[in-house]
Amino acid sequence: PCVERNGMIFGYLGPGDPPPLPAIDSLVAPDSHVFAFKGFLECNYLQAVEVGIDPAHASFLHRYLQDEDTDDAYGRQFRGGTGDEDVPVTWIMRNFPAPTIDVQRTDFGLQIEARRHLSESRDHVRVTNLIFPNAIVIPMSKSMAITQWHVPVDDHNCYWYAHFTSYDAPVDTPRMREQRMELYRLPDYKPRVGRFNQWGYDPSEQEDETYTGMGMDINVHDQWAVESPGAI
């Protein structure tokens, strides 16, 4: 009843024969093009799903007050460029904070489109897919997407399990892992920041670098948003 696919093990706990895994990109791509990782959150799984599918919060929670060279954005969400003109996503999110949101029901869950009208000739469109009951597929860059499952530990804690899927070159696995190990520790994959150190909050950073003052990794921003209310 268990299947290993691109660094993850999926188990079927229902009656009868297990159904086939869905043919989503991260499960059919070659393992050379997929990087797997996970992280612990002190919130219930539904809170983690909600923060992942919300298409508007990025303009505030993940707002960077300065734009960086988009060539240095590999492996980091909301940091690259978009479109043929390579406009920094940080600039778009900062200057167009109120997207038009359209939600469509699908046979797998929901498709959520966030459209930011940049000019008379340009729109920025970001599409998020929610695969019921607990998976999301979100764009990470022009050539990479994240497929992420949110799995309960108990009523107040969960793990996220993510596939980072590249649509062009093979994934730079050592680089992706090094980036994420800056925030997480082994063997339990718990974050190095949290309520115990105010999620790394730095008021001086908040003045001129980030909206939250909690570092450059968006996982910390989301972690603060779902953990700070306390157990729900």
Predicted regions and their residues:
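Short, Gly/Pro- and small/polar-rich lid/capping loops
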Residues: E4
